[in-house]
């Protein structure tokens, strides 16, 4: 959960945030082996290593994302609440909130925090905000602030459509750094990507490909809208579109994250479930409540769930 979205990719949220539970699972093993805990003010080597140039570049996206459907399915005041599960155990909570327009942008905020159980080995609390264009839903800026076992991590990311650049200014512990990337056809962030996906013109077989920022790196997500299916959750019954794909880290293609997302097939286009798979298992975000302007709040009730994941 070093990037506030397991959810997310949100999808990617899944690709990015999923690393926190993985680290949590590894912590007990290190302790049992007698390994010394690293100085909390010294960032791990993998956090500070500059991006590499792979011998074989990741294939580019065949095409840009299709025109988005209208009208926009969400608006300021919408609040979505999720349970986060890692490797079969509840790991924490996450919220996604659409804020009021700010200087011509539509901010969307994601907050995530581990629960008491997971905090025994990995305490994580973080917030991310994506500033989206109100029509195209492309980001102009993305900010992130998280505390992980008392180590503070921040990132301020600027997206420039003119030259497709992504400038990353970050601080891990007390050490600042900067990365510069160039995205291919579409550049998103892990917080805003799920909102754009809600507006895709869903149909079976629709290809989806874009670059996404997460964990100070740029990833390329390639996927497909697989099919329309019925999903039963404690929060309600839904007909939903099922999307699946793989996120590949551009500077280190061997790092891949499998992603599965279900989005309701109705005017609300709710992100129902997002699953990211790791070597240790699956990390999942499940919608448990939603509040939308002009609608009655809906919360999960005890009941059966019908979903393959």
Language-model regions, residue ranges each:
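Signal peptide processing junction and immediate N-terminal pro/mature segment
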Residues: 15-36
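Acidic, serine/threonine-rich low-complexity disordered tracts
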Residues: 29-161, 199-309
């Amino acid at each position: 959960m070093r990037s506030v979205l397991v959810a997310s990719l949100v999808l990617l949220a899944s690709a990015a945030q999923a690393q926190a539970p993985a680290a949590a699972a590894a912590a007990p093993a290190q302790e049992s082996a007698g390994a010394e805990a690293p100085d909390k003010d010294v960032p791990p080597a993998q956090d500070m290593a500059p991006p590499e140039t792979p011998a074989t570049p990741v294939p580019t996206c065949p095409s840009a994302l299709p025109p988005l459907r209208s009208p926009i399915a969400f608006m300021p005041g919408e609040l979505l609440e999720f349970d986060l599960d890692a490797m079969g155990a509840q790991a924490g909570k996450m919220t996604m909130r659409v804020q009021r327009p700010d200087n011509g942008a539509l901010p969307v905020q994601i907050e995530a925090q581990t629960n008491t159980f997971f905090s025994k080995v990995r305490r994580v609390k973080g917030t991310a905000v994506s500033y989206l264009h109100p029509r195209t839903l492309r980001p102009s800026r993305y900010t992130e602030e998280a505390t992980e076992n008392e180590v503070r991590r921040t990132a301020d990311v600027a997206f420039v459509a003119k030259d497709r650049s992504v400038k990353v200014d970050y601080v891990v512990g007390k050490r600042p750094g900067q990365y510069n990337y160039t995205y291919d056809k579409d550049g998103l962030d892990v917080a805003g990507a799920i909102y754009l996906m809600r507006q895709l013109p869903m149909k079976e077989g629709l290809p989806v490909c874009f670059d996404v920022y997460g964990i100070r790196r740029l990833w390329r997500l390639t996927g497909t809208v697989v099919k329309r299916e019925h999903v039963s959750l404690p929060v309600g019954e839904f007909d939903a579109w099922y999307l699946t794909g793989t996120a590949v880290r551009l500077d280190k293609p061997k790092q891949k994250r499998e992603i599965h997302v279900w989005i309701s097939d109705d005017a609300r286009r709710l992100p129902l479930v997002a699953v990211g798979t790791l070597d240790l298992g699956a990390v999942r975000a499940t919608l448990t409540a939603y509040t939308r302007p002009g609608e009655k709040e809906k919360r999960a009730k005890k009941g059966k769930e019908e979903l393959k994941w």
